């Protein structure tokens, strides 16, 4: 377990170039198995989940050449081989489920651990993925603590309607559809920026996809797939994180941002706490006039609300970042996670700083800002943005705080501590058995 120790109270100042979004990188890596042509990917972050997938590729016999210094990855899956009896996909990464479609397409079989994990956000069902695999002609069964997915012949085109706009299920549909001859359509598809980035990679391979960025995708499958080069965009989660860190500490942080078109709702949510975001010339900056203050709604007798749901709603993954702003702001605000049933249990840790947070139900909390906060030792669950949110609060308080179990940060932010130090923060990793 790794912990973060921070000496807070220093306004952050400087410029940051964010890394790529792991939620785009991981599905793209899985998709590379579909082609036997050489590929070069630029901007690949040196994070734990990437290393795990590359280790899988090496085990399967793929040619993997990763330059961690430059973030350039060369892949060639020409000699890849899969044996369902010998090879199991790791359960500790939820993204490993996206290796199933390319393995099905190339080898007719995939074996997946029965308890696929990820961040501890509550129950995360595997059934929607099973429905997609079956829709394309796959057979799914349980065997010796794992899920065995088989396909007797080529995958066939299909039309499918998701009951929930799931990111990974959408990506699994596209991966299956790319290998299935004919036209497949998906309704209620996820449309997050990282899903759009993944779809752009698929089009580079030679897959025609209509409706990218909408809730209806049409995939023309069965074409021979090629190779090429692809460069990842900056992670909008990390952009938002460093803008929020600048705002909560009263500093001045400028963040590289080549896709400000994804930020109108994020910008309006910052404005609810008295923070104005400026985008210019490929960079973004947070401006704060005076203390953080929750803006009073025009409607009488209601709280300012931040409601998080699938894109184009406010992104669920960013909700903890704004909860941190809420406990530091003057005024009260309600935060509503409309997706996960176990994602707000951590907010009790904020009371250790002296914050006042009321849990309405598993999906909603209310922050009562304005309390004088003090340094503390807090424990993060295994949720990336929660560890960062606890760090944000600690960084805004004079004195030494410790964020225990901050390990999940390494899953998404390869240079988090180095970037913080460049902005003037006194912070260090510590480890314990």
Model-derived regions: residue spans:
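Short, structured segments at the rim of ligand-binding sites
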Residues: 1-433
